[in-house]
């Protein structure tokens, strides 16, 4: 029978590396979206189209207290969703504990003209002077990753 160290190894939550793409269908553009996760939980951020909000076009894992820039986003309008939680389950493509689901209320509009392209910065944590509003969504409303 193993000691306490063996028990602790077994119950360590599973975490992917920041920047791990779970879905990557938005290649070929110039747009950029920097996402800062200043919260104490890991996140999976998802971009989907307003026409088909339940179908993820991009999904990337961002660890707690970390940030990541998604590059190469093609022109279009997208909704930004995110799930927060602990202990990622790669089979079910979801967090197993403390899971919450949210969506930014404003759509993101990416446009490229000549050498100019759209960049956004989104913070998942509240910031002083921040203008973006989020709203909770149910697991059923959240884009599926399976």
Please identify what each model-predicted range represents.
Residues 1-58, 83-146:
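Primarily secretory-pathway and cell-envelope proteins
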Residues 63-65:
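Tight coil/turn sites that cap or link beta-strands
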Residues 69-77:
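Short Pro-Gly-centered beta-turn/loop motif in secreted/extracellular proteins
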């Amino acid at each position: 029978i193993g000691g306490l160290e063996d028990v602790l190894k077994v119950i360590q939550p599973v975490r992917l590396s920041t920047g791990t793409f779970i879905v990557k269908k938005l290649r070929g553009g110039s747009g950029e979206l920097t996402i800062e996760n200043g919260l104490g939980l890991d996140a999976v951020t998802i971009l989907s189209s307003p026409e088909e909000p339940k179908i993820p076009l991009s999904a990337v894992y961002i660890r707690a207290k970390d940030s990541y820039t998604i590059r190469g986003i093609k022109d279009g309008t997208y909704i930004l969703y995110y799930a927060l939680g602990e202990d990622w389950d790669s089979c079910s493509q979801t967090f197993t504990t403390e899971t919450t689901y949210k969506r930014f209320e404003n759509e993101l509009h990416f446009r490229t003209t000549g050498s100019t392209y759209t960049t956004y910065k989104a913070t998942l944590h509240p910031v002083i002077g921040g203008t973006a509003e989020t709203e909770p969504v149910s697991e059923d409303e959240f884009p599926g990753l399976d």
